[in-house]
């Protein structure tokens, strides 16, 4: 019962979509309506509003971190922490508060990994940053980081009696699956690079002919 309750709370935390909330608060269009239609920091960046993208990134990472941190704070066993990690991640992918239309989970997964162990989170985040810097593809960086995250975890903690390692692997598999459309675009040379503006995301209520 304790594990079920912890997982449910984690799922509800994960269901808070900061991309949608921040965009609405800052007078931007719903990120599910433009660009990749993904409610995540990279797509919010396509609105041209870097502040909104940064706030989205921080919020999505924080909810992953706080869910796992709370589980540890209250002394839950590793099995429960593993379920909490998966639940908060799934909450981001399929948020009950936003008609189950969620993001792809990169920032939330990063927050989870940082809470599991700072070295694990930083190593995975550094992998993302290196690939993103050289190739300018957020999706490619996410895919590479997803592949390396379970390897980093095994290297740091091994596999014996380590249910969290299975949670990390499950998140990586889900993250890759959520990027299946991006994989097709990467192979076809049609994937958008970081910073591309596919569509103006200013609120339609802007005055003077829609000037920003």
Swiss-Prot record:
<dbReference type="GO" id="GO:0005886">
    <property type="term" value="C:plasma membrane"/>
</dbReference>
<keyword id="KW-0997">Cell inner membrane</keyword>
<dbReference type="InterPro" id="IPR003811">
    <property type="entry name" value="G3P_acylTferase_PlsY"/>
</dbReference>
<feature type="transmembrane region" description="Helical">
    <location>
        <begin position="3"/>
        <end position="23"/>
    </location>
</feature>
<keyword id="KW-0808">Transferase</keyword>
<dbReference type="Pfam" id="PF02660">
    <property type="entry name" value="G3P_acyltransf"/>
</dbReference>
<dbReference type="GO" id="GO:0043772">
    <property type="term" value="F:acyl-phosphate glycerol-3-phosphate acyltransferase activity"/>
</dbReference>
<feature type="transmembrane region" description="Helical">
    <location>
        <begin position="139"/>
        <end position="159"/>
    </location>
</feature>
<keyword id="KW-0594">Phospholipid biosynthesis</keyword>
<comment type="function">
    <text>Catalyzes the transfer of an acyl group from acyl-phosphate (acyl-PO(4)) to glycerol-3-phosphate (G3P) to form lysophosphatidic acid (LPA). This enzyme utilizes acyl-phosphate as fatty acyl donor, but not acyl-CoA or acyl-ACP.</text>
</comment>
<keyword id="KW-1208">Phospholipid metabolism</keyword>
<keyword id="KW-0472">Membrane</keyword>
<keyword id="KW-1133">Transmembrane helix</keyword>
<protein>
    <recommendedName>
        <fullName>Glycerol-3-phosphate acyltransferase</fullName>
        <ecNumber>2.3.1.275</ecNumber>
    </recommendedName>
</protein>
<keyword id="KW-0443">Lipid metabolism</keyword>
<comment type="subunit">
    <text>Probably interacts with PlsX.</text>
</comment>
<keyword id="KW-0444">Lipid biosynthesis</keyword>
<keyword id="KW-1003">Cell membrane</keyword>
<keyword id="KW-0812">Transmembrane</keyword>
<comment type="similarity">
    <text>Belongs to the PlsY family.</text>
</comment>
<feature type="transmembrane region" description="Helical">
    <location>
        <begin position="78"/>
        <end position="98"/>
    </location>
</feature>
<comment type="pathway">
    <text>Lipid metabolism; phospholipid metabolism.</text>
</comment>
<feature type="transmembrane region" description="Helical">
    <location>
        <begin position="51"/>
        <end position="71"/>
    </location>
</feature>
<feature type="transmembrane region" description="Helical">
    <location>
        <begin position="115"/>
        <end position="135"/>
    </location>
</feature>
<dbReference type="GO" id="GO:0008654">
    <property type="term" value="P:phospholipid biosynthetic process"/>
</dbReference>
């Amino acid at each position: 019962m304790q594990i079920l309750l912890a997982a449910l709370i984690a799922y509800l935390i994960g269901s808070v979509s900061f991309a949608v909330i921040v965009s609405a608060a800052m007078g931007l269009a719903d990120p599910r309506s433009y660009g990749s239609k993904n409610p995540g920091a990279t797509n919010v960046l396509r609105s041209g509003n870097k502040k909104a993208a940064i706030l989205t990134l921080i919020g999505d990472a924080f909810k992953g971190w706080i869910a796992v941190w709370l589980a540890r704070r209250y002394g839950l066993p590793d099995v429960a922490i593993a379920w909490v990690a998966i639940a908060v991640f799934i909450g981001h992918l399929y948020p009950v508060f936003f008609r189950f239309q969620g993001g792809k989970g990169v920032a939330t997964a990063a927050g989870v990994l940082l809470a599991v162990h700072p070295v694990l989170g930083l190593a995975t985040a550094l992998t993302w940053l290196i690939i993103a810097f050289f190739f300018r593809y957020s999706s490619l960086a996410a895919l590479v980081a997803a592949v390396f995250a379970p390897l980093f975890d095994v290297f740091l903690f091994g596999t014996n009696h380590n249910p969290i390692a299975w949670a990390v692997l499950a998140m990586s598999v889900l993250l890759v699956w959520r990027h299946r459309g991006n994989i097709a675009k990467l192979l076809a040379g049609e994937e958008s690079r970081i910073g591309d503006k596919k569509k103006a995301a200013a609120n339609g209520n802007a005055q003077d002919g829609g000037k920003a």
